Amino acid sequence: MSREEYFLDKFDEGLIEPSMLVRMTQLWQETHGLEADGYFGPMTAASFNPPSSTVMHPFGLSVLMAAISDLGKGEEGGNNSGEYVESILGKEFDGDNDNDGSWCAAAVSHWILEASKSNNVTIEFSTSFGAKALYRNILAVGTEVSEPAAGDIVCWDRGAVGSWQGHIGVVERYESGFLHTIEGNKGSYPSKVRRFRYDLSRESRLEGFARFTDSSVSGSNA
């Protein structure tokens, strides 16, 4: 008996109830950046069969894992403030609720540094607390891609068109025209590291996507 036939039998026997399927669907959705409504729609179905043709770089996946481990961390006490924010900005936590500065790029830089430590490799580019600067640095030793994949870096333009201002995050996955990311410092206080979803057809201010390559890192595990 196949596993599919086994579960169909259990459903017919009443051992598996519809409410259980709803809850299992919600649990899957919660861990895959989907709205946890319990309905098995097209996006949920697509998440079971993600595209496999794109080659993802292992260092990028390590950066993504570092980002996932920071989910829920962020501002405390005041805007752009708190122990986590100050630590990734390279400041000693002083307990004040003062504004310590934007931290989206600091978060991505932190995840990159954590990935380099866990893989015992050296990054061949400079991190930065500026979103566009960090994106350019990664791109200088990486490659720009039109179709993002897990572990890629995504950057947006902010402020006046062409200004230095930007926003940056890590791609968790891309499927069916929707981009799923992990970002910090987006939204009003208290902003946290969290998952976001975008319809790329509506994103008019994307700077682009950068993918790590073998030239991005060096070392024993590179």
Give the ranges of each region predicted by the language model.
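Short acidic, glycine/serine/threonine-rich helix-capping segments at coil-helix boundaries
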Residues: M1-P50
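Terminal peptide-recognition signature
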Residues: T25, V108, G151
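Catalytic alpha/beta core of large soluble enzyme barrels
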Residues: G187-R197
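N-terminal capping segments
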Residues: A45-K117, N221
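Extracytoplasmic/periplasmic, Sec-exported soluble proteins
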Residues: E13-L21, F40, V55-F59, D96-C104, ...
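Low-complexity, Gly/Ser/Thr/Pro-rich intrinsically disordered linker/tail segments
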Residues: L200-A222
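...with weaker cross-activation on analogous glycine-rich loops/strands in unrelated enzymes
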Residues: P58-L61, S118-Y189
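Surface-exposed patches in mature extracellular/periplasmic domains of secreted proteins
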Residues: A36-F40, G74-V85, N119-S128
